[in-house]
Amino acid sequence: MTPVSSDYRPNHIFLPKFRPDKITSECNTPQQQNVIAEGLYNVSEPFPIRNTDEERYLDTKEIHHTWDNTIKNVVRSIVSIKGSALRSFDTESAGSFCATGFVVNKTLGLILSNRHVVSPGPISARASFINYEEIDIYPIYRDPVHDFGFFRYDPSSIRFHDVTEISLSPESAKVGIDIRIIGNDAGEKLSILSSTLARLDRPAPNYGIDNYNDFNTFYYQAASGTSGGSSGSPVLDISGAAVALNSGGSNSSASSFYLPLDRVVRALRCIENNTPITRGTLLTEFLHWSYDELSRIGLPREFEYDCRTRVPSSTGLLVVSRVLRNSEVSKALEPGDILIAFKTDSHKSTYIVDFVSLFEVLDEMVGKTIELHVYRPKRGFLTFQLTVQDLHNVTPSRFLEVGGAVLHDLSYQLARSYQFSLNSGTYVASSGMLNWSSGTRDFLVTRLANKPTPTLDAFIDVLVQLTDNARVPMHFRVLGKYEEEFTIVTVDRHFFLASIFSRNDEKGTWDRQSLPPPQPSISRRPSVIPRPQEGSKSMEAIQNALVLVHCRMPYSINGFSSTKLYSGTGVIVSVVPPLIVVDRSVIPVDICDIRLTFQSMSAMGHLTFLDNRIAVVSCDYLPSNSVQLNFVADFLRTGDECTLAALDEDLQLLTKKTTVRSVSVVETERSSPPRFRYVNCEVISLMDSLASTGGLVFREVGDDREIVALWISVVHQDVGGKDYTTKYGLSMSYILPVLERLKLPPSARAQHVPTTAGVEWSHITLAGASTLGLSQTRSSEFYMKSRENGTIPRPLYVISHLRPLLHKTSLGVGDILLEVNGKMITRLSDLHEFETESEIKAVILRDGIEMEITIPLYPEYPTFSSRAICWMGAIIHPTHSSVFEQVEPDVDLPGPEGVYVGSILYGSPALNMLRAAHWIVAVDGHDINTFDDFYHMLLEKPTDTFVQVKQMNRRGATSIVSVRPDPLFWPTCIIERDSNGRWCTKHLQRKTKEVCS
């Protein structure tokens, strides 16, 4: 089948100019008959023609004039729709879209569009008329199968536009009629495409197995070349009536596909009469086969003759294509059965020749029994008594949101696509906590905590019995795979609000019901498998000291655009209190969940300390076989022998004796968007490494093992934006001072905050320094000093300013550092003894001249945020230090920290309005200087009106946007620690106290 795509997403394409086809003037042609039928000419008058030597052409001037009048009238009914799918649901993903609709009843305010526009899930949409007047529209009906649905608007809200309505005329659709498709094609507000209706019996287009697909209906086809944004456009004849609804198009040709309006008219009449729109189904997909195809599978020729005699226009019959697994009908019908007729209590035997004749009866017989007659090849004519199911009951209308995941009952759409039976499991539309990656979807949860979850209600019953952070087994099945899979998930009830949403079609909105709070957590110390101990000198002691650390970020913040699982190896550095040190790449941000996996147990971790190099994690308890290793604050030298001990993902200890290749300053490129990176850090490279998650480096001194470095991962970003990882050793000289500082009371820790000069250092060779003016005497001094230290003689020089907006420094790019407070500096570690000073006296080489300057030192600026606010779907937090590395020097940032947009969630009001990696500098004309200013502003801000936001990028360019809050689906929340140090999401309510979820 030719691949096709929905006209749902805008994509710009080139549209060739329209050239009207030549119309012959033969008096008996269909074209002339159509023109006469439309009343353009009096039959008694001569038919106007233009004579030439070879041909005669119909004068189309008056036809164009009529199309002009038609278009002038109908464009007042057509609206451009812009909206957002607020949550992933069924076959639809969260995100913004544009489409088309048209008014079919201006008194009730009804707009017709496609089902994939109206959407089965929650959406927020606005419609714009031709005069750019905008109104709110609310979805009130979407067909469970066919690609149409209705919006409703308030007619009294239209102030300046004279709305007309377009009548629906399915009977006017005929092969060969001229049509116009008017809509928001390619997002261009109003496009008019011309074509000729070519086919009325095309199979429903196939948009792909994971997407919404229509079935059990014919489609119309014409070469109109519609594209994204034209979904929901009316297919108009010359009288201005809609003969079909534009739905999709081909990727490889100009073919467009239109939905017939037979069932649309019925649904519209039900809405107008305020009666339920019943939809019946046999949970079976039918296809229309021609009589020749039917004869090849055994349909008797005499029966074909009878069918053609009864219905001369018939070209074939309906055939069973597939039946939903484990349904009642699956026990009766089989693929290949040919539908002949049916009989009901209120109908005589009626022959089935097309989809309309079938569903005219099924839609009226919901919950009742029909007698279906079929012809089965090799078996002959058979009769079955079948109960008509309610199609609405197999289409989900509610969902659960918990831990960032969206779950609902398995729909008929997906069950049909993958040949699953209904109630096979709870469908995951967005995974959240269930897979630690909110983008993953398309799997069924079949069991949770060892209990079956065939439906959403069963899943909720299990979930409410679980505690926050509980670790439970989950069985699931990925759609498209043949086997069930198994994993262990962590329940998250603290980072996200947990609610059940139910669709309310009367209001066109959704009702929200909060889930009961989780069961209280009970901390139990797990039993540990006893293992023989040989003291701290044994390799087993080292293995027991290594811990796998897993970190999950619930939101993309601080420049980290992925919420994937971060993992690495940490080292137990203190038994009492329990402390584990891990490198910063494993725990990139403060707002996260941490899980520690020891050799025989696992536990939740609590972040105690985070700086530019390491993270210190605590936990409630350690395994009883944990011991204190011997850590030494000493720098290795090039050529030193050492041993690398590391863990693989299976907690197996790997060791390798090796030699130090080099000791150098790590250099990393600035990333986009700005995020933490290792700077001003001296690292150790080894001759031989191991494929591992991390570990430690030790050296043997007699019978003792001295731990001298942590084996870490340094993540770089190349010019193409791709991350790659390099392993280095980080000296314990960076780690042990942090541990000593953590032993101090909180009040004393503030007096021992490390300071920085606000520049990035790197090495330069002596040859390069000599070119810049370094004297021979200085070169000799560097050479001799480096020999003493066992390093390569390379002075430090400034390669960039890290925070020019915050730290005014007397150092310039290219300055070579020679001395600090009278001490020669030959390596970066020589600066450690000055990191608590407020200023230093330095001798530098600048422009070939040695000079003495005073360098002010500043407290290190945080590289992470310890709290954040979710506002209209934007994750907002104080600016982290990496942003200031990539700011124009003359940018005037309000306030000392600024309010920074870390990320935008899909489907939120902020999507396509606010920009990630921008500052919010004003809201409704009020300047925002600090995070606290922003927080207090939100407590006073109403949530039912548009908000004007002024934002600024790192180049200082500003823009103003208007965003409308959505307190139902996107309430304002603050993410911070509670009094016990645990993460908690608090719902901010205007002029009321916070309520912790």
Curated annotation (Swiss-Prot):
Keyword Glycosyltransferase listed: no
Extent of Low complexity compositional bias: 521-533
Domain Peptidase S1: 78-268
GO molecular function, one term: serine-type endopeptidase activity
Keywords, alphabetical: Cytoplasm
Species in which this protein is naturally found: Schizosaccharomyces pombe (strain 972 / ATCC 24843)
Taxonomy of the source species: Eukaryota, Fungi, Dikarya, Ascomycota, Taphrinomycotina
Presence of the UniProt keyword Cytoplasm in the record: yes
GO annotations of cellular component type: cytosol; nucleus
Protein name: PDZ domain-containing protein C1685.05
Subcellular location(s) per record: Cytoplasm
Primary location class: cytoplasm
Signal peptide segment: none
InterPro entries: PDZ-like_dom (IPR025926), PDZ_sf (IPR036034), Peptidase_S1_PA (IPR009003)
Pfam families for the chain: PDZ_1, Trypsin_2
Boundaries of every PDZ domain copy: 870-955
